[in-house]
Every structure is written in C-alpha cells, then in structure tokens.
C-alpha cells in the first residue's frame, strides 16, 4: 500500500521506518521540503514537495506534525476518504475535535488516533485478561506516568498541560481496559523543581483520583522529571488477581531490598519504552489501509480522553471534584 507520511520529525521518522518495515511504499512530506528529502534518503524511501501531497494518490496518510498543525492538515485530508493515522491529540480543544470527527463521518474517513500504549504487549495482555474475567471484579488501578527529562520551553508553548499532553494516555487506557467511561475526577498539582512549568500555569508533578461509571477507582501520579529514567507503569487489582505492567529489569526505580536484578541502563525516554508498541500500532494502521481490520483506536478515544483532561484542569481551578 502507498502511504504518505506528513512530518519529518521524530514521530514521522518512526512511522515511516515501521511502515517500510511492514512492506508499505512510503513517501515523506514536510513543510520544509529539505527535511523530507533528508529523512527519505536516510530511510531509503521517496519524498516529494509538500505542495504535491494532494496531487498524488495514496492509500493512507500519517499525520506526524506538531500538534498545532493537526486540524488544518486533517481538514484537508479527510475529504479524500482514505484512512489516516494521526498522532494524539487531534486537537487541544473539544470543539475542533468534534469538527474533525463530524467531517470524517461525512466522508466515511477512518481516523486512527496514536495512543500507542494500547499496542504495548504487556498492556494489551493485561487488557485481555481483564476482558476475559481473569482478574475478576476490578477494584482499583494505580498508574505511573513519569517523564525522564523536563520539557523545553518550546515544547511547553504548544503542549496544552500535563493532563492534555501526558495523562491523556492514562485516561485512554482506563476507558479501554475498564470498558467504561470516566465519571468524576479530582486533581492536584505543583511545581516542585522545574520553574518553566509555572510560566504556562502547568506543573511538574500531578496526582489524580478518578472513578469510572462502573465504579472502578483509579489513582494516577505524574511527574515531568524522573532522574532514573522514563517510568510508565500500571497496576490492576481485582477480586481474582493482581497485575503489574511495566515492572521489569529496565524500570527506572531502585529496589531497596535488592531483590530485583535491574539492568544498568534503564528506559531513557518514551520512544525506547514504547518502541515495540509504536511498531505494532503502525502495522495495525497498515492493516487498516488494506481493509483487514476495523479501526483499533477511533477518534472518539481522543475526544473522551481530552474531556477528562479538561475536567482535571477545572478541578485544579476549583479545588473540587469535577463530573466529566
């Protein structure tokens, strides 16, 4: 299948590499044509001038640009009726997200949202165990979302907040694993170390307590700096079993008892932590373009996760729990 990758940055490179590895014909586009040319040369695929993207025929499109360009690009690609893989978020506002979804429905265009954690093998296995009843009645979920290095000012300008950028992944997983909506949230936050977050009314630490419509209680902790590495973990507790996901030799934490033989080098970033997940997600999109599978992560997923993030921000402002 012929797939156009729009964006020649870090995620564009990952998507192009994985799609090429899965047998797709990839053409890279970027608003800076030279960047597309350089990446294509590195990967051994085609590139083309950005202005030519609509004059060529493709079986699918990947939108891997900066967040603030997503809506404009999606609005121009959706009427073509071909499947689109868009990195999260579709937009930082519910209104724009709804407009994109409505247009996609009008043209029958499938938009797969880039929530790669769904494709992480241990997380996927845990979700299946929950679905199969192996964990029993769900009691609680404990989630950890800890970045290794704090964000740059350039990144912060367009990220939204720790809830819209980082925790949307957690909100999506909660909905996906529990198969229920998030009903109520209570969030607290602080700037403990990295003052650049205060400039944007953001935080470098966060703590969220939430409840799903099915009654599952969830606790989430987030940090923008973990000196040991990138730490994303999930613990699931139920009436039949308790599961730990993301706890392995490369988990960036020190075991005081010394029982776990940790590797000398831990996960240093989200790409390393979820590299296999990104590959499986790209492969799923390739299958979607072939009509072999249904959409594994439809745009409603992005919309609902965003709504929860906004509810967390409202909770911060009011100091009270907020119904989603």
Name what the model sees in each region.
Residues 68, 92-152:
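A contiguous active-site-proximal alpha/beta segment in oxidoreductase catalytic domains
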Residues 153-217, 223-228, 300:
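Rossmann-like dinucleotide-binding domain that binds NAD(P)(H)
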Residues 43-103:
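Beta-loop-alpha module in the N-terminal Rossmann-like domain of NAD(P)-dependent dehydrogenases
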Residues 80-82, 107-109, 216:
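A short helix->loop->beta-strand "cap" motif at the edges of active sites that frequently abuts
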Residues 1-43:
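N-terminal Rossmann-like dinucleotide-binding module
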Residues 86, 111-113, 220, 245:
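Hydrophobic residues in well-ordered beta-strands that form the structural core
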Residues 198-199, 213-280:
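NAD(P)-dinucleotide binding in Rossmann-like oxidoreductases
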Residues 20, 24, 60-63, 98, ...:
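C-terminal helix-rich "cap/oligomerization" subdomain common to oxidoreductases
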């Amino acid at each position: 299948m012929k797939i156009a990758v729009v964006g020649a940055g870090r995620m564009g490179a990952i998507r192009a590499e994985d799609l090429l590895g899965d047998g797709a014909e990839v053409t890279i586009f970027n608003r800076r044509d030279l960047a597309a040319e350089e990446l294509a040369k590195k990967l051994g695929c085609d590139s083309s001038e950005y202005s030519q993207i609509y004059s060529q025929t493709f079986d699918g499109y990947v939108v891997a640009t900066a967040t603030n360009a997503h809506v404009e690009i999606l609005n121009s690609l959706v009427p073509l009726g071909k499947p689109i893989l868009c990195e999260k978020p579709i937009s930082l506002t519910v209104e724009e997200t709804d407009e994109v979804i409505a247009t996609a429905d009008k043209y029958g265009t499938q938009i797969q949202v880039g929530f790669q954690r769904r494709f992480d093998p241990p997380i996927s296995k845990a979700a299946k165990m929950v679905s199969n009843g192996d964990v029993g009645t769900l009691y609680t979920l404990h989630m950890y979302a800890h970045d290794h290095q704090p964000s740059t000012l350039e990144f912060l300008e367009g990220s939204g907040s720790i809830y819209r950028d980082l925790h949307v992944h957690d909100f999506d997983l909660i909905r996906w694993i529990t198969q229920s909506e998030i009903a109520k949230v209570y969030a607290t936050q602080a700037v403990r170390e990295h003052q650049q977050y205060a400039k944007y009314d953001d935080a470098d630490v966060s703590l969220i307590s939430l409840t799903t419509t099915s009654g599952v209680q969830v606790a989430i902790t987030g940090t923008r700096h973990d000196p040991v590495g990138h730490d994303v973990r999930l613990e699931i507790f139920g009436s039949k079993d308790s599961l730990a996901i993301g706890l392995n030799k490369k988990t960036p934490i020190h075991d005081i008892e010394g029982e776990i033989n940790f590797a000398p080098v831990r996960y240093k970033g989200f790409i390393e932590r979820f590299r296999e997940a990104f590959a499986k997600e790209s492969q799923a999109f390739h299958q979607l373009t072939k009509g072999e599978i249904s959409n594994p992560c439809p745009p409603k997923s992005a919309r609902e996760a965003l709504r929860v993030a906004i509810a967390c921000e409202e909770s911060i402002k009011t100091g009270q729990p907020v119904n989603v």
